[in-house]
Curated annotation (Swiss-Prot):
GO cellular component: cortical endoplasmic reticulum; endoplasmic reticulum membrane; perinuclear endoplasmic reticulum
Gene that produces this protein: CHO2
Family the entry assigns: Belongs to the class VI-like SAM-binding methyltransferase superfamily. CHO2 family.
Enzyme class label: transferase
One MF annotation (Gene Ontology) recorded for this entry: phosphatidylethanolamine N-methyltransferase activity
Protein name: Phosphatidylethanolamine N-methyltransferase
Species name: Arthroderma otae (strain ATCC MYA-4605 / CBS 113480)
Chief localization: endoplasmic reticulum
Composition bias, Basic and acidic residues: 14-27, 344-354
Swiss-Prot/TrEMBL keywords: Endoplasmic reticulum, Lipid biosynthesis, Lipid metabolism, Membrane, Methyltransferase, Phospholipid biosynthesis, Phospholipid metabolism, S-adenosyl-L-methionine, Transferase, Transmembrane, Transmembrane helix
């Protein structure tokens, strides 16, 4: 069934599915947007560059049409692409048969690497640093040579002719934004790589193609029919996807600019997540089937896996950053006003683990805290009895499986054990949930003994998690016992069975991960059976396409194991698992969802809607009749079970102890040293670095600090000034390092890990290098010194005229945010020459310190409800530090103790980690990052600190009285 959540957030599940980005900045129209009048402009697609420049996006043709259609104008780049494709085809016929397979395997893998690694790197750099646009600006290839600023006039004319030939309407090379022209050039590179990638793959399949000797004619026909069907389906997916997303998303246009239009996603984007990368590769397996070659199959799987890696590492991060940005933070008054709806109902998440919607710790909570999750390796906590029990049980199953022989009697008991645990996991757990749904039996049991419903919820999570582990551990153990290695891998379908089985197992793992990502911890453990506050449905993630993904895809792995083992016993277990899984959905989950959400339930998911639209009316009527018969049968079974259900008493009592161990990891010292061989032409005395000490703090923790090292507050921006000779390199840069990292004062041998700023704009291929740059190359006067003149005369052989001062270049920059070391210590700045690691100047050392909180001014004996003294004091001390942890950004940094943190706390753990470290150093209390995210503001953190201190004080008094 569809799963409920607090917010119906769009998923961005389809490949290159782009939502419209609203831009509120003033529009700076370019020359291309004014042609044709306002009426005509409305009919055209309007693009918008990152700086707000609007322009008309010309109509472009798809890759295949512009290359192969005779009606499309051709240019030199088209001829180049077609020539390279032709060379591939000629090479196939010229090579000897024994060379064809390895040569074309290498060719295809090379083009695939150019696609996934080459294009992936370019897009990653463009997304994060605008690298390709910076290259275009630095080389000035799009600047009109008539201005005298373009050093490559012939290249300019060539690119202009190439692009204007392909886009005859609504396009002017001189007037188009640099982002759009850069994208057009990038498109031509993509055309070459993609066409050669596909061509080399097809030629590799032809080289490997053969007919098995034992294959009969019927199997041959069936193999080609299925293979052609997959290829045609692949072709339809590509064409339909291009119809929806057009060239803009097909060629990753939003890495360069955005379009102002409503984007609709239907057709193939309703059928599967990331259709271009998932079902869009079905043709690979169709070609493998027609070629009847395992070589083609394995290279297809490798290419498909590389494409998914491209999606995860390149596409998804950009989509999240561009289209799924956190909503604007609500201020205190807005949050209070929106906390209650018009009907007086509080708005809480239903089946979502989003902790930002939780009530603060001091006030009553409607939903359980998600600060200590249970599912996943990253949440493993061996101090928790559930986790330690799960690990011990899995070790026990492993030992029993490995140490016992695979005799029929042991195989029988392993299969029986797996069947019993599957029955418990479906029938037993289903019975508990059904009782909880109708009579709240599980919760009432704990309330009867004075526990809260949160304790009942925690105990239920442990029970369900342990049951699920036992179910699948026993199934895996049974599969291992029933499995035997094939005697001859080349005989029959042994390899194919293992490949398909592994694919089905991977499909179940992916489905489970997708379900957990959509539902969160709350939905994974059926939280709406235990909490009733303001349910709201969500159809994000995998639920956008399927109502019950666990019904089929969620059990694909058990059939994969049955296929690999080829055992009747495993087929029985797979059939039992699937039958019980469907029964659990129909008899337990579906009735509860209907009772809770009623008509709010969606009838058909995206995939079902797409299939129904393609069915004739007669099939639709038959489908409705079958649904009615199934519903009546299920109602009858429910009535029988209700009358015959025995009373089941279930209770589990455990003591939960929450601790965490955090290890502060310092970056590894990687020596990547680049040295400029000749720096003799520069006056070393003209280089200097000075730290602005206006923001230094006075430590009030009682420690004597007799050193003259300036001290800065943790996370506060640090402003520095530099000077250099007028002829200094434009690629100079300043890095921030911890004292002791670099033993040499002449050369830096440790990476700065991104903590550096360029002295001049446009010198490096990254916009991040200029972040923090305030001024550069301001000419100032610097006093001469006798020593400096003497040293300079010895080095350069020249003498400077005697004067009281001479001119040098100067600049200012500020280090803040990710360019700071988020730890305590003593640091220094280093000025480096010409993009290398030669040190030209070093700043005065300075210290980053977090002042210790002084508990002496807090009353030692606080009444039970009198923690306000400590809470207020902690709030005042903590607020400035927390503001620094959030980079003093008004969008996410709290201005008061009551104001909530920005939504970036949820998506980026770095802010929470900074706060955790600061609290630990300031108060001696170590919280988990989940606690910071759940508390949501300084007031709640201060309240939590007061509670911990009160417990410590109570514990100390009880120890003293003994």
């Amino acid at each position: 069934m569809a799963k409920p959540s607090a917010v119906d957030q769009p998923d961005g599940a389809g490949l290159r599915e782009r939502k419209t980005k609203t831009v509120e900045e003033p529009v700076k129209p370019s020359a291309t947007s004014g042609d044709g009048g306002a009426a005509q402009t409305k009919k055209k697609t309007i693009g918008r560059t990152p700086d707000g420049t609007a322009f008309t996006v010309p109509h472009t043709r798809d890759m295949v049409s512009q290359l192969l259609s005779p009606s499309e104008p051709k240019n030199l780049s088209d001829i180049l692409v077609l020539s390279i494709i032709g060379l591939h085809i000629v090479l196939l016929y010229l090579l000897p048969s024994y060379f064809r397979i390895p040569i074309f395997a290498v060719l295809f893998l090379s083009w695939r690497a150019a696609y996934n690694i080459g294009i992936g790197w370019l897009l990653h750099m463009q997304s994060n640093h605008s690298t390709m646009v910076l290259w275009a600006r630095q080389t000035k290839i799009f600047v009109n040579p008539a201005t005298g600023k373009n050093p490559h006039p012939k290249l300019y004319s060539f690119i202009k002719r190439e692009l204007e030939t392909k886009i005859p309407e609504d396009y002017s090379f001189e007037d188009a934004p640099i982002e759009y022209n850069t994208w057009l050039v990038f498109r031509r590179v993509v055309d070459l790589i993609l066409m050669c990638d596909f061509t080399s793959y097809c030629l590799f399949a032809i080289a490997c193609g053969s007919r098995p000797a034992e294959e009969n004619f019927l199997v041959l026909i069936l193999r080609w029919i299925v293979g052609m069907g997959l290829v045609l389906f692949n072709l339809w997916v590509k064409l339909d996807a291009h119809r929806v997303v057009k060239d803009f998303a097909w060629y990753w246009g939003d890495f360069f600019y955005l379009v102002d239009q409503e984007l609709t996603f239907d057709g193939v984007f309703e059928m599967a997540p990331h259709p271009m990368y998932s079902v869009g590769y079905a043709g690979y397996y169709g070609i493998s089937l027609m070629a009847a070659s395992y070589k083609v199959l394995f290279i297809s799987i490798l290419a498909h896996a590389a494409q998914f890696a491209f999606l995860v590492l390149v596409e998804n991060p950009h989509i999240e950053k561009t289209y799924n940005a956190p909503p604007p933070r609500k201020r205190v008054l807005e949050s209070h006003a929106a906390a209650v709806t018009a009907n007086g109902e509080e708005k809480f998440s239903r089946r979502s683990s989003d902790s930002s919607d939780m009530a603060p710790p001091p006030s009553p909570v409607a939903l359980p805290s998600s600060t200590h999750n249970l599912v996943g390796v990253k949440n493993l906590d061996l101090h928790r009895i559930t986790d330690s029990s799960v690990i011990l049980i899995q070790l026990l199953f492993f030992a029993l499986t490995m140490l016992t022989p695979a005799t029929p009697i042991y195989q029988f008991f392993f299969v029986l054990n797996a069947a019993v645990w599957r029955l418990w996991y479906s029938v037993g757990i289903g019975y508990i949930l059904n009782c909880q749904s109708h009579r709240r039996e599980w919760t009432r049991h704990f309330v009867k003994f004075g526990e809260t419903k949160e304790e009942a919820w925690n105990q239920w999570k442990g029970t369900y998690h342990l049951s699920m582990t036992l179910c699948y551990a026993s199934f895996i153990a049974a599969a291992w016992k029933m499995y035997t290695l094939p005697e001859n891998w080349g005989y029959g379908l042994a390899i194919l069975k293992h490949v398909l089985g592994a694919g089905l197992i991977a499909l179940q793992i992916w489905t489970s991960v997708s379900i957990y990502e959509s539902l969160g911890e709350f939905g994974w453990f059926f939280g709406d059976f235990f909490f009733d506050e303001a349910p709201k449905l969500t159809y994000s993630g995998i639920y956008r396409f399927l109502n019950n993904p666990e019904r089929v895809l969620g059990l694909a792995g058990v059939w994969g194991a049955a296929l690999i083992t080829s055992s009747r016993a495993m087929i029985f277990l797979a059939l039992l698992s699937h039958t019980l899984g469907i029964a659990f959905i129909q008899l337990v989950e579906r009735p509860h969802m209907q009772k809770l959400y009623g008509r709010g339930l969606r009838q058909d998911a995206g995939l079902v809607r797409s299939i129904k639209r393609s069915l004739p009316p007669s099939f639709k009527q038959l489908h409705g009749s079958v649904d009615r018969i199934l519903d009546e049968s299920i109602e009858f079974i429910e009535e029988v079970l209700d009358t015959a259900r025995p009373k089941l008493a279930a209770g589990v009592t455990t003591f939960v102890k929450d601790t965490s161990e955090l290890f502060h990891k310092y970056p590894a010292r990687i020596t990547i040293t680049r040295i400029e061989p000749d720096v003799a032409g520069y006056d070393m005395n003209d280089y200097s670095l000075s730290v602005d000490t206006a923001d230094c703090i006075t430590i009030k923790d009682g420690a004597e600090d007799k050193s003259e090292v300036p001290v800065f507050e943790y996370g506060s921006p640090i402003k520095i000034s530099w000077t250099a000779p007028l002829n200094h390199s434009k690629k100079d840069w300043v890095g921030l390092y911890m004292i002791g990292q670099n033993p040499s004062r002449e050369v830096t041998k440790v990476s700065s890990w991104g903590r550096w700023v360029a002295t001049n704009e446009g010198s490096f291929d990254s916009v991040l290098s200029e972040k923090g740059l305030l001024t550069s190359d301001t000419v100032v006067s610097k006093p001469d010194s006798a020593n400096a003149s003497a040293n300079n005369s010895k080095k350069s052989g020249k003498s400077r005229k005697k004067s009281s001062a001479h001119e040098v270049a100067s600049g200012q920059m500020v280090f803040s945010g990710d360019k700071l070391w988020w730890t305590q210590g003593v640091f220094e700045f280093r000025y480096h020459h010409n993009g290398k690691h030669n040190v030209m100047a070093t700043s005065r050392p300075f210290e980053i310190r977090i002042p210790k909180f002084d508990d002496e001014h807090i009353p030692s004996h606080l009444p039970p409800n009198g923690g306000g003294f400590m809470t207020t004091a902690v709030e005042q001390a903590l607020l400035p530090i927390v503001q620094n942890c959030f980079d003093r950004d008004p969008e996410i940094s709290p201005q008061t103790a009551e104001e909530p943190f920005g939504c970036e706390t949820e998506s980026d753990l770095k802010y929470a980690k900074r706060v955790v470290y600061a609290v630990h150093q300031m108060f001696g209390i170590e919280f988990a990052t989940e606690v910071v995210r759940a508390d949501g503001n300084v007031q709640n953190l201060a309240w939590r600190h007061a509670q911990v201190k009160r417990r410590e004080h109570t514990y100390s008094r009880s120890r003293a009285m003994k």
